[in-house]
Amino acid sequence: MPHSDEQGSLGAKELWRPSSREKTQIYDFMSKVGQKYDIPLKDYNALWQWSISEPAKFWEEIWHYTQIKAHRPYKQNLLYPANAPDENDVAIIGATEADREFISWKELRERVRQCANALKEAGLQTNDRVAGFVGNHANTVVAMLATTSIGAYWTGVSPDTGVHAVLERLKQIEPKILFADHASLYNGKVHGSHAKVREIVADLPFLEVLVVFETAKDVDFKFEGVRPANGKVVTYNDFQSAVQNESASLEFASLPPDHPVYILYSSGTTGAPKPIVHGSLGTLLQHKKEHLLHCDLRPGDRLFYFTTTTWMMWHWLVSGLASGATIVLYDGSPFRPFDVEGGNGEMAMPRLIEELQITHFGTSAKYLSVLEQAALNPSKHAHRPVSLSTLKAIFSTGSPLAPSTFEYVYASIHPDIMLGSITGGTDILSLFCSGCPILPVYKGEIQCRSLGMAVTAFDPAGNDISASGEPGDLVCTVPFPAQPVMFWPPGPKGLEKYRKSYFDVFGPNIWHHGDFVRVNPVTGGVVMLGRSDGVLKPSGVRFGSAEIYNVLLKHFADEIEDSLCVGRRREGIDSDETVVLFVKLSLASPLPCQSSRAGFSPSFAKSSVLVMFLASSILVLRSQ
């Protein structure tokens, strides 16, 4: 039920309080744990304290409650969840700006079987790598599940990523097979990918097979120039139809619990992005804990997160299958145009929620702030208003959700939902702090520190200051199963990268994440204050200054003598970080600012375009 008249500590204003705590899965879990161990668990904070003080018992109970099947690998738990829906129920809804696709559990399993057989006949083996230069559509999920069923590792990069950034990642892991979309539909326009794919394939000498998804109509995608030097190129349909044993059953490789399933990448702050390898059991256990307990996700619910395949939230979304939920994939602009209705497309996602009866909607803080600035009220829109009656929760991440946006959501989007501002990272492929269906929502606060995650705030000397309400570095003081299994490459080199990334600040037993936070000692909520390291996060897009510098060095070495890339966020003025690039132009070859900015387009992700570009013949650097 909505609340707006109560104040928590440190000025936290209560906006919502759950009305049916006893009906949630987390309440059921808390009751069962309390009875089994004969301990008084009266509220969430008591449960959280127990989960971090008794981690072995806690994770054992999570194992039993989530009903993960130990004899089944990660992908089998997704395709055959414990609370399995009817095989004819919808498992995946794939949506674009133009089309809808409804895939049953039975059809999904069959498509994975066909793709897995094709991959095996192409020579894919356990521990090989498969990459996807692909959008957020159903065939991407099928390819990932088929890949991991064999024991190979999956890595995804969105087609809007620049060629330079793609190669910085893929050249390190050397994929044997690459899936690629031949085009994408975005904001009403079809964008062909032939030029990008040609450049990518040309710089991957170890690639054996390029499989092309035909993702848009009437696109001229010629195979000339995209064939791997030592391999072949084939359409996805031909890739599957060429299988010799068409009736081969779907088999799942039996592998160790920490066998890799995903490779994601660090931001590239200190050089090339580091490949972060995540294991199957830790990922599955963590995601099911978050979905069942923190999101109250159930069979029959419809989970949607607006995400690209690069972002960690894609993997989090796909794991919703393991809870028996229907996952909704959307590939396109969140503000697709509505010519007959005018405006800037702000109603696109609310209408998608209404049309597809989405129960759990995830997005970025930036998206919600855009709706706030437009003063959008979906239920009072002049053209085809929507009630959003199926909506149970909204999740926001990528950057801190502004306090005013909290109030906007309850005033204009829906008065009685759980607004889960959440935070975690690519590094753990999950959440440190999350929503909670048995806790109130306070303005500007993430509801809680996640179960099993011993999150606290440290001052520079390594003292726990969370009880004081003072800001500090986000750290985790107890191990958790979703830690990466390794950094690529395997061996001492990757291990050293791993250690330096998280355990170099406060010692070998304290995970240092790089976020600056404040814990409310009364509500237990967490306030995100930004990054404490050099990572840039405009609009939630996480990348490092080194990626900018690498593009400058490659394309503008003669024109730009020196540069400095920084993030700016003015207290009380800016709700998001602005990326500013200062460049010192070479006197011998001055370059207009506009051409320098344009030069970033083909080499860097369009979602990471610089907001401010300042050029001068002088660049003064001072140490502080």
Language model: regions and residue ranges:
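Conserved AMP-binding/adenylate-forming core of the ANL superfamily
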Residues: 45-50, 91-145, 162-167, 232-241, ...
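Structural core segment of the AMP-binding/adenylate-forming
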Residues: 149-238, 364-365
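AMP-binding/adenylate-forming catalytic domain of the ANL superfamily
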Residues: 209-214, 606-624
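Conserved ATP/PPi-binding loop(s) of AMP-dependent carboxylate-activating enzymes
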Residues: 450, 463-504, 541-544
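Gly/Ser/Thr-rich phosphate-binding loop
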Residues: 299, 323-325, 359-362, 372-441, ...
